[in-house]
Amino acid sequence: MITKAHKGEVGLGLPEKKKKKKKVVKEPKTQYSVLNSDNYFAEVCPRATPPLKGVIQEQAPRMPLVKKKKKKKGHSTICEEHLEPEITLRAGRTERSHSPRTQALGLSKSLSAEKRKSMSPGSRVKTSPDPRQDEEVTRVGKKLKKHKKEKKAKEATAFSGRDPWFCEAGNTVYTHSVGKDGVREQAALGQKQKQGSPREHSVKMKKKKKIHWEGDPPLGHPECSWSLESSPTKGSKKKPVRVEAPEYIPIGDGSRASVKKKVKSKKRVEQADTEEPALKRKKKKKKRQQSEVAEEPWEEEPDTDLEVVLEKKGNMDEAHIDQVRRKALQEEIDRESGKTEAYDTKKWTGTQFGQWDTAGFENEEQKLKFLKLMGGFKNLPPSFSRPSPTVARPSMALSKKAADTLQRNLQQDYDRALSWKYSRGAGLGFSTAPAKVFYIDRNASKSIKFED
Protein backbone atom coordinates (compact mmCIF):
# COMPACT_ATOMS: atom_id res chain seq x y z
CA MET A 1 0.00 0.00 0.00
CA ILE A 2 1.05 3.59 -0.62
CA THR A 3 0.90 5.85 2.39
CA LYS A 4 1.82 9.49 2.96
CA ALA A 5 1.31 12.36 5.37
CA HIS A 6 0.84 15.89 4.13
CA LYS A 7 2.38 18.70 6.10
CA GLY A 8 2.22 22.42 5.45
CA GLU A 9 4.01 25.05 7.45
CA VAL A 10 2.12 28.27 8.06
CA GLY A 11 4.27 31.36 8.63
CA LEU A 12 3.06 34.87 9.49
CA GLY A 13 -0.54 33.95 8.72
CA LEU A 14 0.21 33.38 5.00
CA PRO A 15 0.01 29.86 3.52
CA GLU A 16 3.04 28.65 1.61
CA LYS A 17 3.18 25.91 -1.02
CA LYS A 18 5.64 23.14 -0.29
CA LYS A 19 5.95 19.94 -2.23
CA LYS A 20 7.50 17.10 -0.28
CA LYS A 21 8.50 13.91 -2.00
CA LYS A 22 7.35 10.68 -0.47
CA LYS A 23 8.76 7.23 -0.70
CA VAL A 24 6.70 4.30 -1.86
CA VAL A 25 6.70 1.78 0.94
CA LYS A 26 5.33 -1.65 0.26
CA GLU A 27 3.88 -3.15 3.39
CA PRO A 28 2.66 -6.66 4.02
CA LYS A 29 -1.06 -7.05 4.26
CA THR A 30 -2.08 -6.46 7.82
CA GLN A 31 -5.18 -5.31 9.64
CA TYR A 32 -4.26 -1.68 9.06
CA SER A 33 -3.51 -2.11 5.35
CA VAL A 34 -6.92 -3.65 4.82
CA LEU A 35 -8.53 -0.74 6.60
CA ASN A 36 -6.60 1.77 4.49
CA SER A 37 -8.04 0.44 1.23
CA ASP A 38 -10.83 2.46 -0.44
CA ASN A 39 -12.95 -0.58 -1.13
CA TYR A 40 -13.22 -1.37 2.55
CA PHE A 41 -14.71 2.00 3.41
CA ALA A 42 -17.01 1.86 0.39
CA GLU A 43 -18.44 -1.40 1.73
CA VAL A 44 -18.65 -0.34 5.40
CA CYS A 45 -20.02 3.18 4.83
CA PRO A 46 -22.29 3.40 1.74
CA ARG A 47 -22.08 7.20 1.79
CA ALA A 48 -18.25 7.20 1.53
CA THR A 49 -16.89 8.30 -1.90
CA PRO A 50 -13.37 8.26 -3.40
CA PRO A 51 -11.38 11.50 -3.24
CA LEU A 52 -12.12 14.13 -5.83
CA LYS A 53 -8.72 15.91 -5.95
CA GLY A 54 -5.16 14.75 -6.30
CA VAL A 55 -3.50 18.14 -5.68
CA ILE A 56 -4.74 20.59 -3.02
CA GLN A 57 -3.89 24.26 -2.79
CA GLU A 58 -3.92 25.37 0.81
CA GLN A 59 -5.23 28.91 0.46
CA ALA A 60 -8.01 28.97 3.04
CA PRO A 61 -7.21 30.33 6.51
CA ARG A 62 -7.63 28.37 9.70
CA MET A 63 -11.10 27.34 10.74
CA PRO A 64 -12.28 27.28 14.35
CA LEU A 65 -12.72 23.90 15.96
CA VAL A 66 -16.22 24.66 17.23
CA LYS A 67 -17.82 24.32 13.80
CA LYS A 68 -16.23 20.97 13.22
CA LYS A 69 -18.05 19.37 16.10
CA LYS A 70 -21.47 20.57 14.90
CA LYS A 71 -21.09 19.20 11.42
CA LYS A 72 -20.75 15.51 11.94
CA LYS A 73 -22.60 14.34 14.99
CA GLY A 74 -24.48 11.61 13.21
CA HIS A 75 -21.42 9.90 11.79
CA SER A 76 -21.21 6.18 12.33
CA THR A 77 -18.98 4.94 15.12
CA ILE A 78 -17.76 2.09 12.94
CA CYS A 79 -15.69 4.50 10.81
CA GLU A 80 -14.20 6.13 13.93
CA GLU A 81 -12.99 2.84 15.38
CA HIS A 82 -11.29 1.75 12.18
CA LEU A 83 -9.75 5.14 11.42
CA GLU A 84 -7.80 5.58 14.68
CA PRO A 85 -5.03 3.06 13.95
CA GLU A 86 -4.87 4.20 10.32
CA ILE A 87 -4.23 7.85 11.23
CA THR A 88 -1.54 7.00 13.78
CA LEU A 89 0.36 5.04 11.15
CA ARG A 90 0.17 7.81 8.58
CA ALA A 91 1.14 10.56 11.02
CA GLY A 92 4.33 8.72 11.97
CA ARG A 93 5.47 8.13 8.38
CA THR A 94 6.77 11.33 6.79
CA GLU A 95 9.23 9.88 4.35
CA ARG A 96 9.81 11.42 0.95
CA SER A 97 9.26 9.92 -2.48
CA HIS A 98 11.21 10.89 -5.59
CA SER A 99 8.59 10.39 -8.37
CA PRO A 100 5.74 12.97 -8.84
CA ARG A 101 3.29 10.36 -10.09
CA THR A 102 3.57 8.25 -6.98
CA GLN A 103 3.15 11.45 -4.96
CA ALA A 104 -0.17 12.24 -6.72
CA LEU A 105 -1.50 8.70 -6.28
CA GLY A 106 -0.49 8.59 -2.65
CA LEU A 107 -2.02 12.00 -2.02
CA SER A 108 -5.35 10.93 -3.55
CA LYS A 109 -5.53 7.88 -1.31
CA SER A 110 -4.42 9.64 1.84
CA LEU A 111 -7.02 12.39 1.45
CA SER A 112 -9.83 9.91 2.05
CA ALA A 113 -8.26 8.95 5.37
CA GLU A 114 -7.65 12.57 6.31
CA LYS A 115 -11.24 13.45 5.50
CA ARG A 116 -12.48 10.72 7.82
CA LYS A 117 -10.09 12.01 10.43
CA SER A 118 -11.73 15.43 10.19
CA MET A 119 -15.16 13.79 10.57
CA SER A 120 -14.20 12.21 13.91
CA PRO A 121 -12.88 15.01 16.16
CA GLY A 122 -12.19 12.70 19.13
CA SER A 123 -9.85 10.51 17.15
CA ARG A 124 -8.10 13.57 15.69
CA VAL A 125 -7.23 14.97 19.15
CA LYS A 126 -5.91 11.64 20.41
CA THR A 127 -3.69 10.69 17.48
CA SER A 128 -2.35 13.96 16.02
CA PRO A 129 1.11 14.82 17.43
CA ASP A 130 1.35 18.18 15.58
CA PRO A 131 -1.46 20.79 16.04
CA ARG A 132 -0.66 22.58 12.76
CA GLN A 133 -0.89 19.38 10.83
CA ASP A 134 -4.27 18.67 12.42
CA GLU A 135 -5.71 22.05 11.43
CA GLU A 136 -4.53 21.63 7.86
CA VAL A 137 -6.06 18.18 7.72
CA THR A 138 -9.43 19.52 8.88
CA ARG A 139 -9.37 22.28 6.24
CA VAL A 140 -8.51 19.76 3.56
CA GLY A 141 -11.33 17.47 4.70
CA LYS A 142 -13.89 20.29 4.56
CA LYS A 143 -12.88 21.34 1.08
CA LEU A 144 -12.97 17.76 -0.11
CA LYS A 145 -16.43 17.31 1.35
CA LYS A 146 -17.70 20.43 -0.41
CA HIS A 147 -16.37 19.35 -3.80
CA LYS A 148 -17.67 15.84 -3.36
CA LYS A 149 -21.17 17.03 -2.62
CA GLU A 150 -21.15 19.42 -5.56
CA LYS A 151 -20.09 16.58 -7.80
CA LYS A 152 -22.84 14.40 -6.37
CA ALA A 153 -25.43 17.06 -7.08
CA LYS A 154 -24.26 17.36 -10.69
CA GLU A 155 -24.42 13.64 -11.25
CA ALA A 156 -27.81 13.47 -9.56
CA THR A 157 -29.14 15.89 -12.18
CA ALA A 158 -27.79 13.64 -14.93
CA PHE A 159 -29.20 10.49 -13.35
CA SER A 160 -32.61 12.01 -12.61
CA GLY A 161 -33.39 12.39 -16.31
CA ARG A 162 -32.62 8.74 -16.95
CA ASP A 163 -34.10 6.79 -14.12
CA PRO A 164 -35.68 7.84 -10.80
CA TRP A 165 -34.19 4.84 -9.05
CA PHE A 166 -30.65 6.09 -9.64
CA CYS A 167 -31.46 9.18 -7.59
CA GLU A 168 -32.14 7.15 -4.49
CA ALA A 169 -28.97 5.10 -4.76
CA GLY A 170 -26.84 7.88 -6.28
CA ASN A 171 -24.27 7.87 -3.53
CA THR A 172 -23.63 4.13 -3.65
CA VAL A 173 -23.48 4.06 -7.45
CA TYR A 174 -20.99 6.88 -7.47
CA THR A 175 -18.60 5.12 -5.09
CA HIS A 176 -18.00 2.28 -7.56
CA SER A 177 -18.00 4.33 -10.78
CA VAL A 178 -14.99 6.57 -10.13
CA GLY A 179 -11.55 5.19 -11.08
CA LYS A 180 -8.03 6.44 -11.54
CA ASP A 181 -8.97 8.63 -14.50
CA GLY A 182 -11.81 10.13 -12.48
CA VAL A 183 -9.34 11.11 -9.75
CA ARG A 184 -7.23 13.07 -12.22
CA GLU A 185 -10.18 14.87 -13.81
CA GLN A 186 -11.66 15.73 -10.45
CA ALA A 187 -8.34 17.15 -9.29
CA ALA A 188 -8.50 19.74 -12.08
CA LEU A 189 -12.12 20.56 -11.26
CA GLY A 190 -11.25 20.92 -7.58
CA GLN A 191 -8.56 23.51 -8.32
CA LYS A 192 -11.04 25.65 -10.24
CA GLN A 193 -13.91 25.41 -7.80
CA LYS A 194 -11.87 25.78 -4.62
CA GLN A 195 -11.40 29.56 -4.84
CA GLY A 196 -13.96 30.78 -2.28
CA SER A 197 -14.27 32.05 1.25
CA PRO A 198 -14.28 29.52 4.12
CA ARG A 199 -17.59 30.85 5.40
CA GLU A 200 -19.29 30.05 2.14
CA HIS A 201 -17.98 26.52 2.38
CA SER A 202 -19.21 26.16 5.93
CA VAL A 203 -22.66 27.58 5.08
CA LYS A 204 -22.99 25.23 2.12
CA MET A 205 -21.88 22.28 4.18
CA LYS A 206 -24.36 23.04 6.94
CA LYS A 207 -27.24 23.46 4.52
CA LYS A 208 -26.46 20.26 2.76
CA LYS A 209 -26.18 18.35 6.00
CA LYS A 210 -29.49 19.71 7.21
CA ILE A 211 -31.19 18.56 4.05
CA HIS A 212 -29.68 15.09 4.37
CA TRP A 213 -30.31 14.78 8.12
CA GLU A 214 -34.01 15.56 7.98
CA GLY A 215 -34.92 12.00 7.15
CA ASP A 216 -35.44 9.76 4.17
CA PRO A 217 -38.26 10.85 1.90
CA PRO A 218 -41.02 8.36 1.18
CA LEU A 219 -40.52 8.47 -2.57
CA GLY A 220 -37.53 8.49 -4.92
CA HIS A 221 -38.67 11.41 -7.09
CA PRO A 222 -38.89 14.07 -4.34
CA GLU A 223 -35.35 13.18 -3.25
CA CYS A 224 -34.11 13.92 -6.75
CA SER A 225 -35.78 17.33 -6.68
CA TRP A 226 -34.15 18.17 -3.33
CA SER A 227 -30.69 17.29 -4.62
CA LEU A 228 -31.23 19.45 -7.70
CA GLU A 229 -32.41 22.47 -5.78
CA SER A 230 -29.89 22.17 -2.95
CA SER A 231 -26.81 22.30 -5.25
CA PRO A 232 -25.63 25.94 -4.99
CA THR A 233 -23.68 27.88 -7.62
CA LYS A 234 -20.39 29.69 -7.00
CA GLY A 235 -20.66 32.58 -4.55
CA SER A 236 -24.37 32.08 -3.92
CA LYS A 237 -25.49 32.38 -0.27
CA LYS A 238 -29.19 31.70 -0.81
CA LYS A 239 -30.78 28.99 1.25
CA PRO A 240 -31.89 25.94 -0.73
CA VAL A 241 -35.64 25.91 -1.20
CA ARG A 242 -37.05 22.46 -0.77
CA VAL A 243 -40.25 21.76 -2.64
CA GLU A 244 -42.39 19.29 -0.78
CA ALA A 245 -44.13 17.69 -3.69
CA PRO A 246 -45.73 14.75 -1.86
CA GLU A 247 -47.58 17.12 0.49
CA TYR A 248 -49.41 18.89 -2.32
CA ILE A 249 -50.17 15.85 -4.43
CA PRO A 250 -52.52 14.09 -1.99
CA ILE A 251 -54.28 17.39 -1.27
CA GLY A 252 -54.99 17.79 -4.98
CA ASP A 253 -56.11 14.23 -5.23
CA GLY A 254 -58.36 14.69 -2.21
CA SER A 255 -59.98 17.75 -3.72
CA ARG A 256 -60.57 15.91 -6.99
CA ALA A 257 -61.94 12.94 -5.14
CA SER A 258 -64.23 15.22 -3.10
CA VAL A 259 -65.45 16.91 -6.27
CA LYS A 260 -66.11 13.53 -7.85
CA LYS A 261 -67.95 12.36 -4.75
CA LYS A 262 -70.10 15.49 -4.78
CA VAL A 263 -70.91 15.04 -8.46
CA LYS A 264 -71.75 11.37 -7.89
CA SER A 265 -73.95 12.21 -4.92
CA LYS A 266 -75.80 14.83 -6.97
CA LYS A 267 -76.31 12.35 -9.78
CA ARG A 268 -77.63 9.76 -7.36
CA VAL A 269 -80.06 12.26 -5.85
CA GLU A 270 -81.30 13.23 -9.32
CA GLN A 271 -81.69 9.59 -10.30
CA ALA A 272 -83.64 8.90 -7.13
CA ASP A 273 -85.89 11.89 -7.84
CA THR A 274 -86.51 10.69 -11.40
CA GLU A 275 -87.08 7.09 -10.32
CA GLU A 276 -89.79 7.97 -7.80
CA PRO A 277 -92.26 9.50 -10.31
CA ALA A 278 -91.46 6.66 -12.72
CA LEU A 279 -92.47 4.11 -10.06
CA LYS A 280 -95.65 6.08 -9.34
CA ARG A 281 -96.54 6.09 -13.02
CA LYS A 282 -96.00 2.34 -13.26
CA LYS A 283 -98.24 1.76 -10.24
CA LYS A 284 -100.96 3.94 -11.74
CA LYS A 285 -100.76 2.05 -15.03
CA LYS A 286 -101.07 -1.28 -13.23
CA LYS A 287 -104.11 -0.07 -11.31
CA ARG A 288 -105.75 1.15 -14.50
CA GLN A 289 -105.12 -2.15 -16.25
CA GLN A 290 -106.58 -4.11 -13.34
CA SER A 291 -109.68 -1.89 -13.29
CA GLU A 292 -110.12 -2.33 -17.06
CA VAL A 293 -109.80 -6.11 -16.74
CA ALA A 294 -112.41 -6.08 -13.99
CA GLU A 295 -114.79 -3.94 -16.05
CA GLU A 296 -114.44 -5.94 -19.29
CA PRO A 297 -116.89 -8.77 -18.42
CA TRP A 298 -119.55 -6.22 -17.48
CA GLU A 299 -119.02 -4.28 -20.70
CA GLU A 300 -119.76 -7.32 -22.89
CA GLU A 301 -123.37 -7.11 -24.10
CA PRO A 302 -125.13 -10.12 -25.62
CA ASP A 303 -125.77 -9.93 -29.36
CA THR A 304 -129.49 -10.11 -30.16
CA ASP A 305 -128.99 -11.42 -33.71
CA LEU A 306 -126.95 -14.45 -32.67
CA GLU A 307 -128.78 -17.32 -31.02
CA VAL A 308 -126.49 -19.88 -29.42
CA VAL A 309 -128.09 -23.29 -29.71
CA LEU A 310 -125.29 -25.41 -28.30
CA GLU A 311 -122.20 -24.08 -26.57
CA LYS A 312 -119.23 -26.07 -25.40
CA LYS A 313 -116.73 -24.62 -22.99
CA GLY A 314 -113.74 -26.29 -24.60
CA ASN A 315 -114.57 -25.19 -28.15
CA MET A 316 -114.27 -21.44 -28.63
CA ASP A 317 -115.14 -21.61 -32.35
CA GLU A 318 -118.60 -22.98 -31.63
CA ALA A 319 -120.14 -19.51 -31.55
CA HIS A 320 -118.95 -18.79 -35.11
CA ILE A 321 -120.52 -21.89 -36.74
CA ASP A 322 -122.65 -21.06 -39.76
CA GLN A 323 -126.40 -21.27 -39.48
CA VAL A 324 -126.72 -24.12 -42.02
CA ARG A 325 -124.67 -26.47 -39.93
CA ARG A 326 -126.55 -25.46 -36.82
CA LYS A 327 -129.83 -26.34 -38.45
CA ALA A 328 -128.54 -29.70 -39.67
CA LEU A 329 -127.33 -30.56 -36.18
CA GLN A 330 -130.65 -29.55 -34.70
CA GLU A 331 -132.59 -31.65 -37.20
CA GLU A 332 -130.47 -34.70 -36.46
CA ILE A 333 -131.09 -34.28 -32.75
CA ASP A 334 -134.83 -33.93 -33.31
CA ARG A 335 -135.00 -36.97 -35.56
CA GLU A 336 -133.21 -39.15 -33.04
CA SER A 337 -135.51 -37.95 -30.29
CA GLY A 338 -138.69 -38.62 -32.40
CA LYS A 339 -139.64 -35.04 -33.14
CA THR A 340 -140.23 -35.35 -36.88
CA GLU A 341 -143.69 -33.81 -37.32
CA ALA A 342 -142.35 -30.40 -38.09
CA TYR A 343 -140.74 -31.52 -41.35
CA ASP A 344 -143.84 -33.08 -43.02
CA THR A 345 -144.90 -29.93 -44.81
CA LYS A 346 -141.46 -29.41 -46.37
CA LYS A 347 -140.65 -30.68 -49.86
CA TRP A 348 -137.36 -32.48 -50.50
CA THR A 349 -135.89 -32.98 -53.91
CA GLY A 350 -133.80 -35.96 -52.91
CA THR A 351 -134.89 -39.59 -52.47
CA GLN A 352 -133.90 -42.47 -50.24
CA PHE A 353 -131.59 -44.05 -52.78
CA GLY A 354 -128.65 -41.97 -51.85
CA GLN A 355 -126.09 -40.99 -54.50
CA TRP A 356 -127.79 -43.18 -57.12
CA ASP A 357 -130.50 -40.65 -57.39
CA THR A 358 -127.92 -38.11 -58.59
CA ALA A 359 -126.59 -40.33 -61.37
CA GLY A 360 -127.14 -39.11 -64.91
CA PHE A 361 -129.67 -41.24 -66.75
CA GLU A 362 -131.18 -40.66 -70.19
CA ASN A 363 -134.79 -41.20 -69.11
CA GLU A 364 -136.85 -42.20 -66.09
CA GLU A 365 -137.40 -45.81 -67.21
CA GLN A 366 -133.65 -46.44 -67.37
CA LYS A 367 -133.32 -44.96 -63.92
CA LEU A 368 -136.03 -47.15 -62.39
CA LYS A 369 -134.60 -50.23 -64.10
CA PHE A 370 -131.17 -49.47 -62.71
CA LEU A 371 -132.50 -48.90 -59.22
CA LYS A 372 -134.46 -52.18 -59.28
CA LEU A 373 -131.35 -54.09 -60.35
CA MET A 374 -129.41 -52.50 -57.52
CA GLY A 375 -132.13 -53.48 -55.04
CA GLY A 376 -133.16 -50.00 -54.23
CA PHE A 377 -136.85 -50.74 -53.75
CA LYS A 378 -136.43 -53.57 -51.28
CA ASN A 379 -137.23 -53.15 -47.56
CA LEU A 380 -138.67 -49.67 -47.96
CA PRO A 381 -139.51 -47.82 -44.71
CA PRO A 382 -143.18 -47.00 -43.95
CA SER A 383 -142.52 -43.32 -44.47
CA PHE A 384 -141.61 -43.79 -48.13
CA SER A 385 -144.22 -41.25 -49.17
CA ARG A 386 -142.21 -38.45 -47.44
CA PRO A 387 -138.51 -38.02 -47.92
CA SER A 388 -136.08 -38.69 -45.13
CA PRO A 389 -134.38 -35.72 -43.55
CA THR A 390 -130.98 -37.43 -43.95
CA VAL A 391 -131.06 -36.79 -47.69
CA ALA A 392 -130.98 -33.03 -47.24
CA ARG A 393 -127.38 -32.93 -48.51
CA PRO A 394 -126.72 -36.31 -50.10
CA SER A 395 -123.34 -37.30 -51.57
CA MET A 396 -123.50 -36.50 -55.27
CA ALA A 397 -122.85 -39.13 -57.94
CA LEU A 398 -120.22 -38.52 -60.62
CA SER A 399 -121.26 -36.70 -63.72
CA LYS A 400 -120.57 -38.04 -67.20
CA LYS A 401 -117.41 -35.96 -67.62
CA ALA A 402 -116.09 -36.93 -64.20
CA ALA A 403 -116.85 -40.58 -64.87
CA ASP A 404 -114.84 -40.49 -68.13
CA THR A 405 -111.80 -38.98 -66.40
CA LEU A 406 -112.04 -41.56 -63.65
CA GLN A 407 -112.17 -44.37 -66.22
CA ARG A 408 -109.15 -43.02 -68.04
CA ASN A 409 -107.09 -42.78 -64.84
CA LEU A 410 -107.97 -46.32 -63.85
CA GLN A 411 -106.83 -47.62 -67.26
CA GLN A 412 -103.51 -45.85 -66.97
CA ASP A 413 -102.93 -47.35 -63.56
CA TYR A 414 -103.63 -50.81 -64.87
CA ASP A 415 -101.25 -50.48 -67.81
CA ARG A 416 -98.49 -49.19 -65.56
CA ALA A 417 -98.86 -52.12 -63.20
CA LEU A 418 -98.73 -54.57 -66.06
CA SER A 419 -95.57 -53.05 -67.45
CA TRP A 420 -93.88 -53.32 -64.05
CA LYS A 421 -94.66 -57.00 -63.93
CA TYR A 422 -92.94 -57.82 -67.21
CA SER A 423 -89.98 -55.51 -66.78
CA ARG A 424 -88.66 -56.65 -63.43
CA GLY A 425 -85.03 -56.71 -64.59
CA ALA A 426 -85.20 -53.16 -65.83
CA GLY A 427 -83.30 -50.70 -63.75
CA LEU A 428 -80.23 -48.55 -63.70
CA GLY A 429 -77.91 -49.79 -66.43
CA PHE A 430 -80.25 -52.57 -67.59
CA SER A 431 -82.70 -52.56 -70.49
CA THR A 432 -84.82 -55.35 -71.99
CA ALA A 433 -84.99 -56.24 -75.67
CA PRO A 434 -87.54 -53.96 -77.35
CA ALA A 435 -88.62 -56.59 -79.98
CA LYS A 436 -89.53 -59.24 -77.46
CA VAL A 437 -93.13 -60.32 -77.59
CA PHE A 438 -94.89 -62.25 -74.85
CA TYR A 439 -97.48 -64.88 -75.57
CA ILE A 440 -99.81 -66.52 -73.14
CA ASP A 441 -100.16 -70.22 -74.02
CA ARG A 442 -101.27 -72.98 -71.70
CA ASN A 443 -99.67 -75.73 -73.76
CA ALA A 444 -96.30 -74.16 -74.06
CA SER A 445 -93.65 -75.46 -71.71
CA LYS A 446 -90.36 -74.01 -70.64
CA SER A 447 -88.55 -77.30 -71.11
CA ILE A 448 -86.41 -77.81 -74.19
CA LYS A 449 -87.19 -80.79 -76.38
CA PHE A 450 -84.34 -82.60 -78.11
CA GLU A 451 -85.27 -84.36 -81.31
CA ASP A 452 -83.08 -87.35 -82.25
Swiss-Prot record:
Residues annotated with Phosphothreonine modification: T304
Gene Ontology cellular component annotations, sorted alphabetically: nucleolus
Ranges for region Interaction with ZNF106: 300-452
Positions of transmembrane segments: none
Residue(s) carrying Phosphoserine: S112, S128, S258
Keywords in alphabetical order: Isopeptide bond, Methylation, Nucleus, Phosphoprotein, Ubl conjugation
Main location: nucleus
Crosslinked residue numbers (Glycyl lysine isopeptide (Lys-Gly) (interchain with G-Cter in SUMO2)): K7, K126, K280, K313, K347, K367, K369, K401, K436
Residues bearing PTM Omega-N-methylarginine: R424
Pfam families noted in UniProt: SMAP (PF15477)
Ranges of compositional bias, category Basic and acidic residues: 78-98, 127-139
UniProt biased composition (Acidic residues): 293-305
Compositionally biased residues, Basic residues: 65-75, 140-151, 258-267
Stretches the record annotates as Disordered: 1-28, 55-161, 184-305
Subcellular location field: Nucleus, Nucleolus
Cited InterPro entries: SMAP_dom
Subunit structure: Interacts with ZNF106.
Name of the protein: Lysine-rich nucleolar protein 1
Record organism: Bos taurus
